[in-house]
UniProtKB/Swiss-Prot annotation:
The keyword Transport applies. One of its GO terms (molecular function) is ATP binding. It comes from Buchnera aphidicola subsp. Schizaphis graminum (strain Sg). It comes from the Bacteria. This is ATP synthase gamma chain. The gene is atpG.
Length: 291
């Protein structure tokens, strides 16, 4: 059994750890409120521009944009949004598992994937797997600057327009509530989905565009892609802070339980030492009295 000093040192060590995790929990709570508010403020714009795109694509567009072309899959692009830091539970792990599963499924039918990585954790993981990484952005912080992302976004969009990739996905963590975040992989391009909601053309119609449809639709579709990527970043950042808050609370609670266990062991050792000392005193006294 460990000595009293060793147990006491463990108690001090765990107590210090508890103070750190408690402080990190409080910081995460504060940051989560801000990031959650920022994320919720961004959702209406993201949803409305999605509805605008949906409505535009219901028409019979004279201008056939490359984002609407359905192609045979020869190469896939995936944007992966992760965190820059750890200590957020299994948030990144769950996302990476889904992405790797998707990459492996494409690999089985000889379709390679190009990756755009946002976040240091995704960069460190997918480098190990020898993935085809065409661009990466790290150190985004709690308030990502869209101007830092534009370069990487343009690279992947140019690849799509030049037929170098045939489909584009984005993988991120969707914020549900403070206790629930889940990995999500959505298709960005081409602008259709498996339910084909973007091509339901019962009545042929189109908008009247000024100055011309190409200029407006090019801008609109690019803004749509940018908004979806930026909103995914906000969702992931809010998820990160919520996951870190939960992880640090769990660590704090576990530290508290461990301190109680160690305190109990310490008391037992102390009691055993006292009992042993009393036994030795009584034995010594008995020996003296016999003499």
């Amino acid at each position: 059994m460990a000595s009293k000093k060793e147990i006491k040192d463990q108690i001090i060590s765990v107590t210090n750890t508890k103070k750190i995790t408690k402080a990190m929990e409080m910081v995460a709570v504060s940051k989560m409120r801000k990031t959650e508010e920022r994320m919720r403020l961004g959702r209406p714009y993201s949803e409305i521009i999605k509805k605008v795109i949906h409505h535009v694509l219901q028409g019979s567009l004279e201008y056939k944009h490359s984002y609407l072309e359905k192609r045979n899959d020869k190469r896939i692009g995936i944007i992966i949004v992760s965190t820059d830091r750890g200590l957020c539970g299994s948030l990144n792990t769950n996302l990476f598992k889904q992405v790797l599963f998707k990459i492996q499924n494409f690999a089985k039918i000889n379709i390679p994937c190009d990756l755009i990585l946002f976040g240091l954790k995704s960069l460190s993981v997918f480098k190990l797997y020898g993935s085809s990484i065409i661009s990466s952005v790290t150190n985004l912080g709690e308030t990502p600057d869209l101007s830092k992302l534009i370069g990487s976004i343009k690279i992947i969009l140019e690849k799509y327009q030049n037929n170098q990739i045939d489909r584009l996905f984005i993988a991120y963590n969707k914020f549900h509530n403070k206790l629930s975040q889940y990995p999500k992989i959505s298709q960005l391009l081409p602008l259709y989905n498996e339910k084909n909601i973007f091509s339901n053309k019962k009545i042929k119609w189109d908008y009247l565009y000024e100055p011309e449809s190409k200029l407006i639709l090019d801008t609109l579709f690019d803004r749509y892609i940018e908004s979806q990527i930026y909103q995914s970043l906000l969702e992931n950042i809010a998820s990160e802070q919520a996951a870190r808050m939960v992880a640090m609370k769990t660590a704090t609670d576990n530290s508290g339980n461990r301190i109680k266990e160690l305190q109990l062991i310490y008391n037992k050792v102390r009691q055993a030492n006292i009992t042993q000392e009393l036994t030795e005193i009584v034995a010594g006294a008995s020996a003296v009295s016999v003499d």
